[in-house]
């Protein structure tokens, strides 16, 4: 079994791998997205991409900082750091947003029949991470059904919000 300490870091590792694929190797996400959605191209600035991805990296650090507990506790041993019930919830939200992003990349590839920077890590990292996390937190009792359902809905809801926001920003910048 994977240690909870390692599990806390998995979303951050996944996000960093995905960003590496999108922007370093092979890179080209910004150009690809502007080609894929020309009506939103004005909204996809370097400043926006840095800001939104920095925010996602920070979100992935929240479970690391909070830890996992069913209730607020204090450390009972040196090997068991204090945690909160919110660590698992944030972990699941990050995984849900990541999985929705992975599905966005898959949809774009199927629609265009062209490589989308981020589709590989979206498929082999983001989607399995979300499946693993939802099963793990349910089986360990670290997340209850309402928490799981809310997290599962936040990911797709964020993608819908982001698409609408890109449209709005592009119109105001045009």
Where are these regions (language model features)?
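N-terminal signal-anchor transmembrane alpha helix
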Residues: 2-22
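Transmembrane alpha-helical segments that form the membrane-embedded catalytic/substrate-channel core
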Residues: 16-23, 98-109, 156-169
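Cytosolic, membrane-interface loops and tails of multi-pass inner-membrane proteins
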Residues: 22-43, 165-174
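Core segments of transmembrane alpha-helices
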Residues: 48-68, 100-101, 125-130
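Membrane-interface helix caps and helix-loop-helix hairpins in membrane proteins
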Residues: 72-73, 82, 106-116, 137-142
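Hydrophobic alpha-helical membrane segments
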Residues: 93-105, 116-137
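Non-cytosolic membrane-interface motifs at loop->transmembrane helix junctions
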Residues: 111-124, 143-150
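Terminal transmembrane helical module of multi-pass membrane proteins
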Residues: 130-174
